[in-house]
């Protein structure tokens, strides 16, 4: 993944997650940590929530990570697609430990750990020029050259 995209995702802390069941959309906001090595977002939630039940039947998701602004020249944000799944055993323990490097509230150990395995990411960054975008797809080899530097 391009360094600018990684840096943006790592700097933020909240994402929206959209899922569907029977053609009915549902969206939520979650605090997350980014696992750069695995290109995934780690989040926690209750296992009996509506979205958790939906995700068990349809893991395909879309989402956004953005910095709210009314000033168009400073607009920055990510749109993504991927697959979300609950983690168990060692995977859950490792992901929970990563999550705890950023968050410390008492519910972390009581909730289930989930991931979004990113498959497509599109960064819109107007600081690079109006409506400038950088895209990444799972499996893509990324150039090290930053054409925006």
From Swiss-Prot:
A Pfam family cross-referenced in the UniProt record is PNPOx_N
| Bridged cysteine pairs (disulfide) | none
Q: Which InterPro entries match?
A: Pyridox_Oxase_N, Split_barrel_FMN-bd, UPF0306
Q: Which domain of life is it from?
A: Bacteria
- Give the family, as the similarity comment puts it: Belongs to the UPF0306 family.
Name under which the protein is recorded: UPF0306 protein PM1958
Q: Which organism is it from?
A: Pasteurella multocida (strain Pm70)
